Amino acid sequence: MGSFMAHMPYKIVLETFVIFLPLLFHALYGVYIALTSSVTVQRYRYFRNWCYVLQRIAGIVTLLFVMWHIYGTKLQVELTGVDPSYSMVTGIVATPIGLGLFAIGLLCSIYHFCNGLWTFLITWGITVSPHSQKISGYVLFALFIAFAAFGLKALFAFVG
């Protein structure tokens, strides 16, 4: 499987136009929104208001985590020929700081994804009523818990 992925036809085109450019646009636009949005949690202490703020924080943390991931699994491989292997990840999570950063990045990424889906459903008119928004909130919270449990279990499989 690894050999196929390494020598896949049009790999650079797919990586550039299907992964990198959309992710770059999302990251740049997200940083712009995070830096220009007004935080009103002091005045309005509603749950969804806190989710809005956490979405921005999780987005910035996720951006840093994805940059670290791209460096470790793509750029470092291309520039130095280092093999992104099980032992490399085991070495990163062997320290409490590495494990903590990985876990925080993982959880922020999952939160940003699930809360972003909730916002997407409202913005695109899929969940317009308060009841449908509440139901989608429960479903996406369950998805967050499932992804977090699966992701943390996978992460701790690397801990020796």
Where does each model-flagged region fall?
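Membrane-embedded alpha-helical bundles that constitute the cytochrome b-like, heme-associated redox core
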Residues: 1-160
